[in-house]
Amino acid sequence: LKKHKTEFIPVDSEHFSIWYGLKNFKTINLEKVFLTASGGPFYKTTLNNFEKIKVSDALNHPNWKMGKKISIDSATMINKVYEVIEAKKVFNIGYQKIKILIHPKSYIHAILKFNNGLTNIIVHDTTMKVPIFNTLFLNSNRKLKTNKINTKILNNLDLNNVNVTRYPMVKLLNFLP
């Protein structure tokens, strides 16, 4: 990238949001990155009922329309483990600075907390159109038509810590250097 003076702009919503949130800041000033996860189709399922879960249940994501593999990865939260690893590699951020938060509505895609007291919260509709559009048409005056984020949505952002009993895949992050 440096050799060809090319800028890397991620397309995935969380990583695009980190990139966008860092545009006016340096990673050295970054205190914490919060990647959000919806919790998938089983967020409110009692642990006692996990034995009854079927593959078809896992494929029915409450917020996103995705393919089968990513739907399963989302339901088990292994996709967030991958995204933490990716964020570390792409942005050169230590694992200790990256945390996963549950945000069932999926409007917040990343939260960046800086050591100067500022926090960037990147919010957009639950569609990949937003990061893809902004990656392709960066710094243009084109407009994207999406559902508008409104005050009703912003009044209920609902963030929670990850329950590792419910999502044991997240424990894999404890084994990373």
Where are these regions (language model features)?
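Catalytic, metal-anchored helix/loop core of enzyme active sites in primary metabolism
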Residues: 1-177
